[in-house]
Amino acid sequence: QFGSSIYMILGTKELVDDERLWREEFIVPGLCDISAGTNAAGSLTKWYRNTIFPDALELEQNGGPDAYITMMQDLDKIPVGSDGLITLPYFAGERTPINDPLARGILFGLTLAHTRQHMYRSALESVAYSVNQQLKIMLEHDVPIDQIFAVGGGVKNDLWMQIVADVTGKEISTPAITVGASFGDALMAASGIKYSGFESFNKLTDFIKPGKTYHPNKIG
């Protein structure tokens, strides 16, 4: 879930004992899950919009394009790694794996040669590396992960999704309906009450139409 924050969930057959992650019994009998979260994702891009790109927001408010579209202009010209600018995305503390509300964000390596486009790309990259950090911990428990299904407002950003695919080395798939949490809740509720056509949990994916797919490029 690429929303204001990131929430990752992976189904498992048994409860996993790992204090770096959240773990619980899943709503479907016989299944469990492990999950993880990054506190600043969409909230970080919103901070950049309001603080670093106020002109893009003003342009939108005056009838121009969406501010986030304006912010993406020329971002693809910034090289992978943002010319050495590294962001630690702990702008609102951090959830897993460190579980520290007092953690703080960092811009490391900032020079006079960097632009706000460098800063913004570095922020997007930092969230991707946070996702990868969580993913690596999940993979320690011998649960195969071949593909990441991403939902939420952040999936509208093609470059961001490609960065996540490149950093994790995993294929990223998005659905046609990107408001994943509420749509998924509705499907689960329909299945729970055995609403006609939704009785089988295993067939709920039939109602999820595919959107875009991002294939990882080799980096580094």
What are these regions (language model features)?
Residues Q1-I9:
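Phosphate-binding/catalytic loop of phosphoryl-transfer enzymes
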Residues L10-G220:
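Glycine/Thr-rich phosphate-binding loops that ligate phosphate moieties of nucleotide
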